[in-house]
Amino acid sequence: MIHSIKKQLMAAYQMKDLGAATLYLGIRITRDGKQRSIWIDQEDYIHNALTRFNLLNANDTKTPLPEGVHLVAATEPMSPEKLTRYQQLIGTLLYASIGTRPDIAFAVTRLSRYNTNPTDEHHRYTQYILKYLKGTIKTHIHYDGSSHAGLIGYSDSDWGENKDDRHSTSGQVFTLFNGAISWRSR
């Protein structure tokens, strides 16, 4: 079926068949036909982010955020340079969390709420998450095609934990073949 679709596309458009994808938008794709498995990761993307934000030699952390973190909005504006740096860090972390790292989605979403009024503490926590990624850089999502696991969904919420506006945070993840296919925290 795929070959038929490719043939039709090649007849209609000028295109080349470059074979199986190994890299897509910074996400590395590794296949094993015998095991019927696919792994996706962002190891190179994370390494480049650590280099960009001068954290390549920093000590890693064991969790995305320390236990008991309570974030509040800034009362004083941050300098434009620091604000831009914070927003760049948040954007970098959001891309990783959307691509292959559901383990940081909650932490990044919480910090992104302060994208217009962060504090130095928020900035330290974005670096904390990046240090966590450093320590877990080899983490990947594995889709096990030999598994009989169907679509499974999980969800949770915290009911008004945000101290600024009392909004709840909720999260969900859906898996197929034992690998996450969709996740979100908001």
Predicted regions and their residues:
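Long, low-complexity, charge-biased intrinsically disordered regions
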Residues: 1-186
